[in-house]
Amino acid sequence: MGFINLSLFDVDKLMVWVSKFNPGKILSAICNLGIDCWNRFRKWFFGLNFDAHMWAVDAFIPLMPHYTEQMERVVDDFCSETPESKLEDCLELDTSVNEFFDEEVYKKDEEGVMKLQRSAARKHIKRVRPGMMQAAIKAVETRIRNRHTIFGDDMGKVDEAAVRATASDICGEFKINEHHTNALVYAAAYLAMTPDQRSIDSVKLAYNPKSQARRTLVSAIRENKAVAGFKSLEDFLGGPLSFPVEDAPYPILGIPEIRVAEKRASRVMKSKRVVGLPAVSAGLKVCVHQTSLHNMIVSLERRVFRVKNSAGELVVPPKPIQNAFDSISYFREEWLRKLSHKGQILKSSLADVVACYSSEKRKLYQKAADSLEKKPVQWRDSKVQAFIKVEKLECDTKDPVPRTIQPRSKRYNLAIGQYLRLNEKKMLDSIDDVFKEKTVLSGLDNRAQGRAIAHKWRKYQNPIGIGLDASRFDQHCSVDALKFEQTFYKACFPGDQQLETLLKWQLSNTGSALLPTGELVRYRTKGCRMSGDINTGLGNKILMCSMVHAFLKETGVRASLANNGDDCVLFCEKGDYEQINRNLEQWFLCRGFEMTVEKPVDVLEKVAFCRSQPVCIATQWAMVRQLGSLSRDCFSTQDWLNPKTFKDAMNALGQCNGIINDGVPIHMAQAKLMHRIGGNRKFNLDALHKQMEYSWRDRLGKRTNLLWSEVEDATRLSYFRAFGIEPYIQRIVEEYFSQVEITCEGRSTNVLPTHYSRIHKDLIKAR
């Protein structure tokens, strides 16, 4: 029996005719013709104008048949709880394993002095209880299914490898012996890759005609439904979208150190907006703080004057104990010896310092240099002019406090830059020489950083990586800490009175901030790093590296440090973690710094450094930016509503990210899409420099070729270990990026919905 060609009839007349019959009998007759006829009817039905035929929705939708199965049974099966043994209940201590490790504890000796003592402690290795192997296999299988998204015939070899890696990780978490781990990985992994009855039922539930019909209805309605002021969802997602910035949701504390002067004449300033690409983003909420009186006061209160203690109370930053840095002075002497082998440290001319800058900055610094030729630097040049940093922040988990940049005048920066700017590389290299390996990783591209971190990892037999979280490092730089840092500079230029004066002005700061609305905020601080100082990066590296070196020396722990200012990761043997965890926080607190020892990781790809993680790309290690970058790169405070500016930005982002992420899953696909939106233009260094003035050198190194290399299976597996995104999901997202179409026509809205992207934020989420 054939199916009537409904397109030959007048739809309105046909629907009036259909309405006279029983809708249930019509659907039954169509279903009896077969699934092809049913799908054709469904496609025609949902192409109707529902506003004119709303009765059809009410009549037909409740009667959509289950077609092949009674789906109520499937739902009941899902809801019925079948008790299964927990993995921990299937395990017991394996007494046959005689493996020990050196346990280190501090104990008082006979004289009452705390000394490090080592003793052999048995490793707590477990095995599967007799008769419970089947239950243990089922428990591991369940855990695998909960961590992975898809199982079926479309799984490739790399997907199978990812499943086996997950099974191995589960056994490692529970410290199961090697023999039983081998059995569990082999059995549980392949069981998990074989669809069970629940997997089959879930497919039935998702793809039965009734479920498909409802999804089609939702899609049809969305095409005609207004979203956030737009005529449809497609219109909302189709191009760059502008929305306003907001104030940070924190109350003002009203501390006396901050004063607000009477309102002056306000400047004419256009309200800043953020422009994003909803269709290309990975779905995270991205916010930018506006320059307002509220944000300025909140930032100064919580990033300059007050910190949170362990009880969550806002208090003044901790002070170091007396003579806290005396025990670290040896590091300075050793550093000076290494520095002496790198040639003479000379004061630069103003012209040489000005030449370090480019573009508009060079013009401003040249003007300051001309001024210094006529009038020497004065104390008033060291005054701080603060402003709110315009940065893209991830606001899904918490609302960050606005950041304040606190620069001094360009006259002051040039004066102190004569001593430090051109000598900085030698000073940083000398830190590496003290550690006897590459330690300060700033200035390296992502591949060089990846190689350095992999080298540190391979130095140890049972390696772990320990992140050191220096909470608000600039805020915790006390007067004593800054004085200790300054001894490094003074030792390079002994007896130089001008340098001593310039450094002294950094110990006591007078700051102000003029807001666009006319308010003038004034404040004073003793100590505290001013984030706009020319020696901020160098000083933070000197302080952090010297303190970590002294801590390791005092405790006798053999470890390697990766440092980039206040970003630190320690690499050491697994057995040394407890000693570091037990002593480091108190050791740093005595010197005025609040440090948190993060949970150690025993997989190289899980090491987080400067918001990046190592991934093995075609046998070469490289640092890949964490998943939040997939959202942040899709937002800007530039005028992306202007088609030319938008295409130039997309071209620059696509080129830069395409080079640093060549051969990387998902990241390269997004970069390729951006490059396509930008017109697939050839690499242009000048255009890239214009768009990314501050970071392109460090990002690209010497690479200037867009290769778009094919993603290798081994890279997908390494990417999975780093971020937990299964290879199957990687390919789905890449396919989406290859097909999405974006217009350059910009639009505006007053609010960005919580789930604004086609890619839900939970899909590309580190696990």
Curated annotation (Swiss-Prot):
It comes from the Viruses. Pfam families: RdRP_3 (PF00998). Changing residue 164 to A: Complete loss of binding to the Y-shaped RNA element (YRE). GO terms for cellular component: host cell endoplasmic reticulum membrane; membrane. InterPro entries: DNA/RNA_pol_sf, Rev_trsase/Diguanyl_cyclase, RNA-dir_pol_PSvirus, RNA_pol_HCV. Changing residue 38 to A: Complete loss of RNA replication and membrane association. RNA-dependent RNA polymerase, made of isoforms p88 and p27, plays an essential role in the replication of the bipartite viral genome composed of RNA-1 and RNA-2. Replicase proteins p88 and p27 interact together and selectively recruit viral replication templates as well as other essential components into intracellular membranes for the assembly of the 480 kDa viral replicase complex. Mechanistically, isoform protein p27 binds to the Y-shaped RNA element (YRE) located in the 3' UTR of RNA2 via a direct RNA-protein interaction and to RNA1 in a translation-coupled manner. This is RNA-directed RNA polymerase. It comes from Red clover necrotic mosaic virus.
